[in-house]
Each structure stands twice: as C-alpha cells, then as structure tokens.
C-alpha cells in the first residue's frame, strides 16, 4: 500500500500537554525497567483508603498464571468517581445525557450524581444485595445506567452489564454463568426512533429453567410502555428509591476484590466472563484516560460507545469520572434523525474530545459532506478511534471532514481483556500515521513473535502480537474458569499474553494491527492480513465497506473472497468489477487481487458494529448447515440474504 503520510504533533497541543515526546520516552522507559517504582508513584492517581505497599505480584507461567496489583491497598470506586470531587467541584457537571430524540437532554452535577447513587445503593441493599453479590444490568443508555453501575461499586456488588441489544437467550446465558442475584432493566429502551422491549426480553430470559438465582428485577420507567408485571419479583426503580436515605457510606474494598464481569463472545462454546478487579482497573482507567486523551480540567468528553461494552465501562464511566471530567451519555445512533447528528451533538455540547468507532466513521463517510452539514465542530481538540483497526482513508476523512484538520486522532488498540488502552499515540508526544496505533502505553511491553513463539528482534517485523508482562488493567481470570483463562491467553506462547491479533512494526517502531490472527490469509505461500486488503478496497471512492475471507483453492491454498458494500448511488457492473480488481492489484499487488467479488448492501454485524467474519467464511465456502450462535447479530435476516446472493454467484 502507498506509504503513510506523517502528521507531526500540532504546536497548539505541544504547548499545553501532559506529555511531550521526551516525557513519554522517559516515563515509558521507567515503566518497563522499573514497573514497581513507576506504578508505586502513578497508582496514587486514585485515592486509597488504606494505601498499598505491595505494587506488583504477577506471573504468566503455565499452570501458575496469577495477576495481582496493589493487593494490600483498599479503596472504593464510586468514592473515586464522585465523592472526591464534591468539595471543589460538586456543582460541576458530571454527566450530560443526550436522548435519542434531539429535544431530550439533561445534566447531572457531581452533587446530584452523588445523591442519586447513594439512594440507589440503599435501594439495592433493600432488595437484598450484599457485598460480593452479582447484579446484572440490561439497560438503555440513560443516566440511570451509570447510576446503577456506580451504586454497585459503592456497596461492593459486582456488576455484569449486558448490552441492551442482546437477545433473551444471550441474556439468560450471562445470568446463569454469573449467578446474578438481581436484574436492573427498563420498561423499554429507545434507539434510532424505535422502542427496544427490554423488560419483555428480561421476562423471557428468566423463563429459562437454568436461571435459578434471580430474586428481584428493578425496572426503570423510560417510555411508559406496557409491561407484564410479576408482583413478587418486579420492583419499579422510582418506588424503590422513593423512601430511602440519600446517604450511603462507600464500602471499603480490597484492590483485588472483583469489580465487574463483562462477557465477550468466545470463538467456541459459551461466552467468556472477563473478570476485572477494583484497584488495578481503576488506576489504569484513570491513567489511560488522562494521558491518551490528554484530558485537561473542564473539558467535555464524548465516548459514543454503549455501557454494555468495555469501551463504555472504561471511557464513558470510570476513566472520565475518576478524572472529574464531563462525560456525555448518548442514547441514540450517529445517523438519527439525520446523518449530521453526531456533528450536531458535538456543537450542541461543545465537545472537546470525541471517541468513536471506525464502523460509525465509515457509515458517515459513505454519506459525504451530509455528515457535517450545518455544523462547525470547532470545539474539538482531540479525536479517537476504537474497536478495530481504522483504515487510512477513513482516518483521513475523520481528520479532515469531522476534525477540520485541527484535532489529532488517537487510534487506540486494546481489548475487553486488557481493561484499557494498550497501544495508542499520545497527542502531545506522537507523530501520527493514518492506520497505525503507533506506540505502547506506559507499562505495556508488546512484542511480535513467529508461530513458534520466537521473539522477532528486528525493528521492522510482522508476526503475532503478544504482551510480555502484566499491566494494572489486565483481566484476572475468566469468571469461574481459571483454566480457560490460562488456555485462551497463555498456552499458545509460553510466558506471554497472546492477544490473538497480528501486527507489523515499522522502521519507527510503530505498531500496525493487521487483524485477528484467524483473519490471516495464506495465498500461494504469502501471508496477508484481511485488514490490509479491506483497507485497499475501502480506499476506492465507490466502496463504503468491505470484508475479506479466505476460501479453499486447489492451487493457491486459499483464494480471496471479498464482500463489498458500495456507497449510496453506486451500483455493481462489469466495469466496476474489473476496476475494483485492478485497484487492489495497484494498491497491494497481484497476489492480493480478490478472486470473488460479492456485492451486497449489508454485512452481518454484531450490535457493537463488528463484522461477524465466522459467518462470512461459512457462507463463502458454502458451509451453511451450522452457522453457530447468531443471537448477537444486529439483523439476523442479513444472513439469508447473503446466502441467496451467493447462490446467484455460482
């Protein structure tokens, strides 16, 4: 592909930043040569009830994987996110809520948030919730979702948030695995102008005979829609909080007490319950938020993620609030009621830092200048990308069109399992290359290894991305299945955390994530990441989105099968077919030319916007007898449509 353009650090950022390049290099060096000293100092970014004296006790050894940080310290997460700001900033805005309907919005100050969290903490206690109990949240994107999470942390309950788009089957599986005691939900959610039947889904999930632990369901009235009511079990939020005190002292928690379980889909079998603990997670969330987004006091931060994903946990709730930031909770979608909604929200709330996903960026990019019509976005200072590698063309569009070429982009690489960002630029320190996540965060030691686990020492290299030592935000185990934790992350390459991603490192030591290792093609002995070919395809001015899978080929081993979605107003033709193949040949080389072009107007995506490649692989190879779990798909009907289109290709 064409050589990346380099964007130097902007002068206006350089003059007022937490870390310039010299600071980054010095801090990073200390963080990897003396992690104990580094985190002993920076662990103090949060307030401790009992200060820690032990910083790090970690092992990646087979059979003895054990991760503990700050283990003899005690603290409370909600006190760090709320109480410690009250004396000086109690009247400052903590949460801005922007409803699905642009006419709906409200704010909560830290004082107001404190009162609501204390009341709901007491309401949870009234429902029998005690320290260590698991509480399941199945909520719309409303302030009460944040209030419920913070209330759990206040009383020492463990929350497990299930994205409100998941099916009753997916919800019941997570309730069963986590032994949750209480479910918190709403009558309905609202998204893109449509009602989401949350309470109905909970009722259905709880009919599963394997669900044996739920004693209460707390229901928030969001729309006032009709719901079935089970008097012995169901409780209205407004009634549960009406008569309780608004004083609730925070529970003193050990650093290694569980904070939350968040489920991520496993490649096989049941979902994995990723367990994060209290001290290390909060330190890492606060630290990465402050430095990666170069957060300055008084700024407004908007992470567009749902609270049901790790990005929503770390960079919508805990990271911003621990730093006393104003955080925006957005109920809607970026293109409703019109394509410029995201830009309108930026202007309306004078957003300084915007953090969104390549999927959203590409969807807006397909609409061209409509995405910014009638808006200035002049308040933006920093923009971020999360969820998957961002292709250079989408990066450039985001930078130029949304950001007016004024805001550096922090392209962040991390996972549910990592708790926070592992590789990303720092705005005041790192020259940017579109498509590269650039350099590791403090304390993170990435390496590239070959398939035998040998570390590739050369600066320029490509291989499997591993992390050589622990960091505070790392998950501690798979809930209830430590052996699965070891097998999944530490058995492929001994003594290393395997990310399951591939990456290449360039001459400047920058990392370029090439995609999941199982998304690597081997065509005539040439290894290629699917992300690289997809990037080349979406660089074509007529293509909105592309997904690449490999299919068996008698001669080449694998052939390249491309699913392609065109921009509005473009249509497939024999000329375009040839043009697209020639384009990839020019961008990457003949070896990367797709063998099959499958034109379609929609791809199978999970509700978080990730393309479900497993299904695309099966459709491409004609193996559609067992497509596995499709409960997490946003629109399951896409699958039948793709199968029908495939039949016409043959």
UniProtKB/Swiss-Prot annotation:
<dbReference type="Pfam" id="PF16177">
    <property type="entry name" value="ACAS_N"/>
</dbReference>
<feature type="binding site">
    <location>
        <position position="516"/>
    </location>
    <ligand>
        <name>ATP</name>
    </ligand>
</feature>
<feature type="binding site">
    <location>
        <begin position="191"/>
        <end position="194"/>
    </location>
    <ligand>
        <name>CoA</name>
    </ligand>
</feature>
<keyword id="KW-0460">Magnesium</keyword>
<feature type="binding site">
    <location>
        <position position="543"/>
    </location>
    <ligand>
        <name>Mg(2+)</name>
    </ligand>
</feature>
<dbReference type="InterPro" id="IPR000873">
    <property type="entry name" value="AMP-dep_synth/lig_dom"/>
</dbReference>
<dbReference type="GO" id="GO:0005829">
    <property type="term" value="C:cytosol"/>
</dbReference>
<keyword id="KW-0547">Nucleotide-binding</keyword>
<feature type="binding site">
    <location>
        <position position="538"/>
    </location>
    <ligand>
        <name>Mg(2+)</name>
    </ligand>
</feature>
<feature type="binding site">
    <location>
        <position position="585"/>
    </location>
    <ligand>
        <name>CoA</name>
    </ligand>
</feature>
<feature type="binding site">
    <location>
        <position position="501"/>
    </location>
    <ligand>
        <name>ATP</name>
    </ligand>
</feature>
<feature type="binding site">
    <location>
        <position position="540"/>
    </location>
    <ligand>
        <name>Mg(2+)</name>
    </ligand>
</feature>
<dbReference type="InterPro" id="IPR042099">
    <property type="entry name" value="ANL_N_sf"/>
</dbReference>
<dbReference type="InterPro" id="IPR020845">
    <property type="entry name" value="AMP-binding_CS"/>
</dbReference>
<dbReference type="InterPro" id="IPR025110">
    <property type="entry name" value="AMP-bd_C"/>
</dbReference>
<feature type="binding site">
    <location>
        <position position="335"/>
    </location>
    <ligand>
        <name>CoA</name>
    </ligand>
</feature>
<protein>
    <recommendedName>
        <fullName>Acetyl-coenzyme A synthetase</fullName>
        <ecNumber>6.2.1.1</ecNumber>
    </recommendedName>
</protein>
<feature type="binding site">
    <location>
        <position position="527"/>
    </location>
    <ligand>
        <name>ATP</name>
    </ligand>
</feature>
<keyword id="KW-0007">Acetylation</keyword>
<feature type="binding site">
    <location>
        <position position="524"/>
    </location>
    <ligand>
        <name>CoA</name>
    </ligand>
</feature>
<dbReference type="GO" id="GO:0005524">
    <property type="term" value="F:ATP binding"/>
</dbReference>
<dbReference type="InterPro" id="IPR032387">
    <property type="entry name" value="ACAS_N"/>
</dbReference>
<dbReference type="GO" id="GO:0019427">
    <property type="term" value="P:acetyl-CoA biosynthetic process from acetate"/>
</dbReference>
<keyword id="KW-0067">ATP-binding</keyword>
<dbReference type="InterPro" id="IPR011904">
    <property type="entry name" value="Ac_CoA_lig"/>
</dbReference>
<dbReference type="Pfam" id="PF00501">
    <property type="entry name" value="AMP-binding"/>
</dbReference>
<dbReference type="GO" id="GO:0016208">
    <property type="term" value="F:AMP binding"/>
</dbReference>
<feature type="binding site">
    <location>
        <begin position="387"/>
        <end position="389"/>
    </location>
    <ligand>
        <name>ATP</name>
    </ligand>
</feature>
<dbReference type="Pfam" id="PF13193">
    <property type="entry name" value="AMP-binding_C"/>
</dbReference>
<dbReference type="GO" id="GO:0003987">
    <property type="term" value="F:acetate-CoA ligase activity"/>
</dbReference>
<dbReference type="GO" id="GO:0046872">
    <property type="term" value="F:metal ion binding"/>
</dbReference>
<feature type="modified residue" description="N6-acetyllysine">
    <location>
        <position position="610"/>
    </location>
</feature>
<feature type="binding site">
    <location>
        <begin position="411"/>
        <end position="416"/>
    </location>
    <ligand>
        <name>ATP</name>
    </ligand>
</feature>
<comment type="similarity">
    <text>Belongs to the ATP-dependent AMP-binding enzyme family.</text>
</comment>
<comment type="function">
    <text>Catalyzes the conversion of acetate into acetyl-CoA (AcCoA), an essential intermediate at the junction of anabolic and catabolic pathways. AcsA undergoes a two-step reaction. In the first half reaction, AcsA combines acetate with ATP to form acetyl-adenylate (AcAMP) intermediate. In the second half reaction, it can then transfer the acetyl group from AcAMP to the sulfhydryl group of CoA, forming the product AcCoA.</text>
</comment>
<keyword id="KW-0479">Metal-binding</keyword>
<feature type="binding site">
    <location>
        <position position="311"/>
    </location>
    <ligand>
        <name>CoA</name>
    </ligand>
</feature>
<keyword id="KW-0436">Ligase</keyword>
<dbReference type="InterPro" id="IPR045851">
    <property type="entry name" value="AMP-bd_C_sf"/>
</dbReference>
């Amino acid at each position: 592909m064409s050589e990346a353009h380099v964007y130097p650090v902007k002068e206006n950022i350089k003059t007022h930043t937490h870390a310039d390049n010299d600071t980054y290099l010095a801090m990073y060096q200390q963080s990897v040569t003396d992690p104990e000293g580094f985190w002993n100092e920076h662990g103090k970014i949060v307030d401790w009830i009992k200060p820690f004296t032990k910083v790090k006790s970690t092992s990646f050894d087979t059979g003895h994987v054990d991760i503990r940080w700050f283990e003899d310290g005690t603290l409370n997460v909600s006190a760090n996110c709320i109480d410690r700001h009250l004396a000086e900033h109690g009247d400052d805005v903590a949460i801005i809520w922007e409803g699905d309907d642009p006419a709906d919005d409200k704010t909560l100050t830290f004082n107001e948030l404190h009162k609501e969290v204390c009341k709901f903490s007491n309401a949870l206690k009234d429902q029998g919730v005690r320290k260590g109990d698991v509480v399941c949240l199945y909520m719309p994107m409303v302030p009460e979702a944040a209030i419920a999470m913070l209330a759990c942390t206040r009383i020492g309950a463990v929350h497990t948030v299930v994205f409100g788009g998941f099916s009753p089957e997916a919800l019941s599986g997570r309730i069963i695995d986590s032994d949750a005691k209480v479910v918190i939900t709403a009558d309905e959610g609202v998204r893109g102008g449509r009602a989401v039947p949350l309470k109905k889904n909970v009722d259905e999930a709880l009919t599963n005979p394997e669900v044996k632990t739920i004693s209460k369901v707390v229901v928030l009235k969001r729309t006032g829609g009709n719901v079935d009511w089970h008097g012995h079990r169901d409780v209205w939020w407004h009634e549960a909080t009406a008569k309780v005190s608004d004083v609730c002292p925070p529970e003193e928690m050990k650093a290694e007490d569980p904070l939350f379980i968040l489920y991520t889909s496993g490649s096989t079998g049941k979902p994995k319950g990723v367990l994060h603990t209290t001290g290390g997670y909060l330190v890492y969330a606060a630290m990465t938020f402050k430095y990666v987004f170069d957060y300055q006091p008084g700024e407004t931060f908007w992470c567009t993620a749902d609270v049901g994903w790790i990005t929503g946990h770390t960079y919508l709730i805990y990271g911003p609030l621990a730093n006393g930031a104003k955080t925006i909770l957005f109920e809607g979608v970026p293109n409703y009621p019109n394509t410029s909604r995201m830009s309108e929200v930026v202007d309306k709330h004078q957003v300084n830092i915007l953090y969104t996903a390549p999927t959203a960026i590409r969807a807006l990019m397909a609409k061209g200048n409509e995405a910014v019509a009638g808006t200035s976005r002049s308040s933006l200072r920093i923009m971020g990308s999360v969820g998957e590698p961002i292709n250079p063309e989408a990066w450039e569009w985001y930078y130029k069109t949304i950001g007016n070429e004024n805001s550096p982009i922090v392209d962040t690489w991390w996972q549910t399992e990592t708790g926070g960002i592992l590789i990303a630029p720092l705005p005041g320190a790192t020259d940017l290359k579109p498509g590269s996540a650039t350099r590791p965060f403090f304390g993170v030691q990435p390496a590239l290894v070959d398939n035998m686990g040998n570390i590739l020492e050369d600066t320029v290299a490509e291989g499997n991305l591993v992390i050589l030592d622990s960091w505070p935000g790392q998950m501690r185990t798979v809930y209830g299945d430590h052996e699965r934790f070891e097998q999944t992350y530490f058995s492929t390459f001994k003594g290393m955390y395997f990310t399951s991603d591939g990456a290449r490192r360039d001459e400047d030591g920058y990392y370029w994530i090439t995609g999941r290792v199982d998304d690597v093609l081997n065509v005539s002995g040439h290894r290629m990441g699917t992300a690289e070919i997809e990037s080349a395809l979406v660089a074509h001015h007529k293509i909105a989105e592309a997904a690449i899978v490999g299919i068996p080929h008698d001669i080449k081993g694998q052939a390249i099968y491309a699913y392609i979605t065109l921009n509005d107003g473009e249509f497939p033709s024999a000329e375009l077919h040839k043009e697209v193949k020639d384009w990839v040949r020019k961008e990457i080389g003949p070896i990367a030319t797709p063998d099959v072009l499958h034109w379609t107007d929609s791809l199978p995506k999970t509700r978080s916007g990730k393309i479900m490649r497993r299904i695309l692989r099966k459709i491409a190879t004609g193996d559609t007898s067992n497509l596995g779990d499709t409960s997490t798909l946003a629109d399951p009907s896409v699958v039948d449509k793709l199968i029908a289109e495939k039949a016409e290709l043959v």
